[in-house]
Amino acid sequence: MAFGRSILVFAVVLWTILFGPATWALAPSYDIAVRDLFPLADWQKQFRITDGKDRGKLVPLSLHHAGGAQETWRLDFGDYAGIHLKNDVNGSLMMDRLDLTKSHSFIVYEPALPIFARDVRSGLGVARQANFKMYDLETGRLKRVGRVTHMMKRVSRSRFETPAGLIDGYYFEIDHRMDMQYAQLHMSLGLGCRLDDGPVYGAGRYTLTKLGFFTETKTAAAGLVSR
C-alpha cells in the first residue's frame, strides 16, 4: 500500500533521524512541556533519506505558520507529505490533516488527533482516537475511511550518539495504528528531542495486515544534513 510507506517516511522525518542509536538512558524526568521539545517557529532544515526506496536523496523539512489563527502550523517534507498542526485550548499539539503527495491522497482526522499532550506526564499511556477519511488529492474522491489510535507509551531522558556528537535529550516510544476495512496499518516510532531545539533522533517501521493474515513490513529513515 503506497500510502503506508508515505506515512512512515513522513512520520520518521517529522521526528528527524540523526542516524545513530540512543546509547544511554538517564534518570527519568517528566516536568517538561511539549513546546520545550517541539518549538513552534518558522524554520527549514535539510535531510538525507538513509533507508528505504529513496535512500540517499536530499529533502527539505520545513515548519511555517499556516496563516489564520496564530496556533496553526504546517510541516512539509519536500514533495512527500505535509502535516497540518494546531494547539488546542489545553496546549496539546493536534494533527487535523495529513497530505500524502506521493500517493496523491490526503487524510482528514475527525476530530483533530492529539499527538502530544501539553506536558509529558499527562500523555503517557493514554490512547487517543479519531476517525479519519482519505481522499484523492486531485479529485476529492473519498478513497478510504477508518479509525486511528495513537499512544505515547514511554519516555526517558537519553543520550544519543549522532554524527554531530553526543546529544542529551528525551526519547519517546510511540504506537500508531490505523484500522480500515479489510486492512490494518501499525506503526512503531521512536522519537528523540533536544530541549529548545526540537527533534534530533527518530526511527520507525510499519506493518500492513490485509484480510487478517497477509502482512508486509517496511522501515524508513532520514538524517539531518544542515539547518
Region spans (language model):
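Bacterial N-terminal signal peptides
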Residues: 9-19
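Bacterial N-terminal signal peptides that target proteins for export
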Residues: 1-10
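Short alpha-helix capping/helix-loop boundary micro-motifs
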Residues: 111-114
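Mid-length scaffold segments of soluble, non-membrane domains
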Residues: 116-145
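Acidic, serine/threonine-rich low-complexity disordered tracts
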Residues: 24-91, 95-100, 106-107, 135-227
